[in-house]
Amino acid sequence: KGVATLKGQVSYALAENSQRATINVMLDGTILSKNVAKKSGVTVNTNGTTTIHAEKRISFDKNGFTTSPATAKAATKLELGSIDGPSSTHESIAKTKFVKGRSVNEEAASQLSVDSITKEMDANVLELLGDVIDGYKTKIRDPLLRRGGFPEQFSTSSTKGFVNLQLLQTGRYQLAASSEPPALNKSTDVSLILHESLVRNFTEVVLGGVELTDEKLVEHLTRFGAEIPDELKIGPGKKSWAITFSNTQPISVGFRNNQIVIAIQGQQFRDGMRLIKEPIRIAATYNVEKTETGMRLQRDGDVAVDFLARKTLTVIQVATKTVMSKKFNALFKDDIVGQGGIKLPGQWENAGNLILQQLVANNGWLMLSYNLDKPSK
C-alpha cells in the first residue's frame, strides 16, 4: 500500500508536419510516493521518487481533430525508510530482500507510473477537446458539406515555429485572386491574408437565399457581445423587418487603396407587412489605418442603399430605402477604433493581447499581422 503525489508542468510545442497542423502536449513531473509493505510481522517503509516525461500529439486537418495515444518515459529511485520487525534477524532479512529486489521494483514502479499517467493524459485531453471536436464537426464541417460550401482546398501544416491554414473557396462560375498577396513580415506571431473573393464565394454558398430577420440579427449581435443600436432593437412598438440574401454576392468585401467596402445584396426585403421584391445593394465604405493602439476604421459618408434595377424610385421604394438606410447606418458604425489589441479568449486570456503590426488593404487583399504582447508580471 502507498500514497503518491505528482507535481508537474504542462507545456506545448508545435511539431514538424507537412500534412496536418500538429501540436505536442507535454507533461514533465515528479512523483513522490510513500509505500508500506507488511509480511510475517515485518513492516517495511520505502520512499519513491519518479521522474516522468509524457507526450500526446494532437493534429488538425480538414476532417477535424485527431489524437495519438499518449506515451511516457519514467525513472524511479526507491529508498529504504525504516524496517520494523520482531527481531533484528527479521529486519536484516527484510533489508537484504529490499536491496536485492530494488531494481526490479523500481522498474515495476516506473511502468506503473507510465500506465497511470498515459491513461490520465488521454482522458484529460479528450475531455478538454471534446467540445472543440464536436463543434468543428457539427457547426462547421457538416453544415458546409450539406450546402456544398466546404472549401475546395483545405490544407493545414505546422513547423516548430508556425501553424499554417490555407483555404480556397471557389466554384465553376466564381472569382479568384488575380494578383499575388502582399509580402508578409514572417517574424510576427499571428497573421491573416485574405482575398476579397473568399468572402463572396463562401457567402454565396452559405447565405444565398437565406432570410435574415431583425430578431436573428439581434441574436447574432448579442452572441458576439455587440451593443444593439436603437434602430435595430426589437420589441413592442418596433416594426419588424427582414432581408433575403441574393444568391450571388450576398455579402462581398473590397480592399482598395486602404479602404474596405462591405456590401450586402438582397433579393427581397420585408418592412412590416410590406414586401419589396427588388434587388438592393447596401454598402459601407471605410477608410482603414493602423494606429498606435491598433486599427481604426472610419466610415466614408453614409451607408449607400441602391435599387440595382432602378434609376428612378417609386414612393414605396423611397420609403424602403430610408428605412434600410437608418438601420444599416446604425449597424455599420461611423468610427470603429481598436484599443489595446485583441484579447484572447478563455484560458488563453492571461497570455496577453495580440497587437497589430502590419495592415494592408489594397489590390483585393487584406493582410493583418500581430505580435503577442505578453503581460508584465
Predicted regions located by residue number:
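A short, surface-exposed interaction/processing loop segment used at functional sites
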Residues: 56-58, 298-302
